[in-house]
Amino acid sequence: VKGSGGMLMMKDALAYSKNPVAVRLIEAAGAKNVIQLARDLGVTEEMKDNLTIALGSSDITIYEMLGAYSTFANYGNYIKPEMIWRIEDANGRVIKEIKPNIREVMNPMHAYSMIYMMKGVAAYGTASSELKRMGINAEIAGKTGTTDNNSDGWFIGITPKLATGVWVGWEDRATHFWSTGEGQGARMALPIWGYFMKKIYADKSLGISPKDTFEKPSDWTGNCSDLQGLGGYGDEGGLRTIDEIRNPKQPSNSNGQNENKNENINDKINRSEDIDFNQ
């Protein structure tokens, strides 16, 4: 995206909340495919079949968000979150116990790739400053979230043994912070997550430590860092595959009669023009 750092790795786009990258990704994958994946990850809320879902146009509860994010920590296995796992009587006898229903929705390599990319949020992105201020030094994958009027803030934090989500907001959207400086997820929700995790780490009986690390799947081949330094902007020439970026083709001799007939949505994004996502 021109004016936003040129070509960006997905890890960096997530780390710095570069939303046009998310829009382009859904444009390439197709909104219907993204919605189907969300359904596989336990999301039941209504989702519009257009590119606005990249910007958070759907009202998804923190409950369903956490179920989806925890799938990445479980290496592709979705486990429906439960409010109550076990009920015991006064003598400790188990009256009822919920057995988790585990469903594989993606392979471990893809799930870990998401973990790898979201680690940038905590390491050097939107969550890094607050985590450092709180003295939390652990392997964390996460994502901050903020509504455009600063009335809602989120942070989903994934550690190797625990996924936790925090939402701060109001039922009445007219109530909000004056600025994103105070109203962003990294300032509203992340501190709550941090205080909670410090309590978790302090309780040794839980077996959760800041020294825990994510285990890489055996078939995980690494990242796309070899693409850095190739030059150009992500919006030059429209959407391209990795092979097309590595091995660009020479432009063909075209009369260009239809070049401007259907203007690419990415050009509008780069010029900050209004977009009709229902076309």
Feature map (PLM): residue ranges:
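Low-complexity, Gly/Ser/Thr/Pro-rich intrinsically disordered linker/tail segments
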Residues: 218-279
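Poly-acidic low-complexity segments
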Residues: 28-30, 107, 276
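Active-site-adjacent helix/loop patches that line small-molecule binding or acyl-intermediate pockets
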Residues: 1-74, 117-120
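Repeat-unit-sized solenoid/scaffold elements
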Residues: 44-54, 190, 194-196, 237
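A penicillin-recognizing enzyme superfamily signal
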Residues: 12-16, 61-62, 66-67, 71-226, ...
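Bimodal feature
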Residues: 40, 130-132, 251
